[in-house]
């Protein structure tokens, strides 16, 4: 559907931001038809109402939001450049892990873990319900925190009693937390200075044997290795939303170079990661401000 605004009343830039807002989405939901494939008629789309301020106010709103969009995109580019730097070092030190002549020892991922229970999926069903979430207590770590490298605070917590009941699903320093749904394979190492928490049902925990595999090396192998990425994509299922389970993840083949070489890479990556944390927090702040202004202007 093409939307061509009357620019004597509303600018296309202002209308575009409105159509990106949660308020617009909520208003559309009431007119959406279909279950598997949702759709909306042109008539219903045209009947969505919005408040239209003066052209001067519209211009001011667009300028503020445009500025924040530029900041957000700039921060994302910085993160990508830092990731590229780490990836270049990874390839320089370990080569192409998908190459047939790769010389490093291989193991199933479960063999690189400290125990048979090293790879764990978060609690399901009656083990943890949303009604048990608290506003403070022991953190429940979810996909959004993994996506930004644990630079944002959790949104759900548990009582100490409930967390003790779910101690088998704990997340401790050095654990690798991986998204098992949607953005499958996205992962982050749980920081040293964070209190222990519990993983959400959409999260997989990988607890490696530190005598053989360093967490940061393994995390970047999961991110950068074409061989690993291909395996994860191959075993991820779901027509609407991709997903991976524990048994499939356990049998992923990974490479295990000598620990001394892993240490050299980890030292380099840790320095770059310090810069990534600063940039990611700046990105989080800019995104929060953008979301807040969108709510303020279009709610």
Describe these PLM feature segments.
Residues 2-5, 57-60, 64, 87, ...:
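Feature detects amphipathic, helix-rich regulatory segments
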Residues 24, 183, 202, 228, ...:
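A generic "binding-loop/recognition-motif" signal
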Residues 1, 10-13, 33-59, 133-135, ...:
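A short glycine-rich beta-alpha junction/loop motif
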Residues 110-130, 144-173, 193:
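Sequence-specific dsDNA recognition surfaces
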Residues 47-63, 70, 74-124, 251, ...:
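Non-catalytic DNA-recognition/assembly elements of restriction-modification systems
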Residues 1-20, 142, 163-223, 243-245:
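A short beta-sheet element
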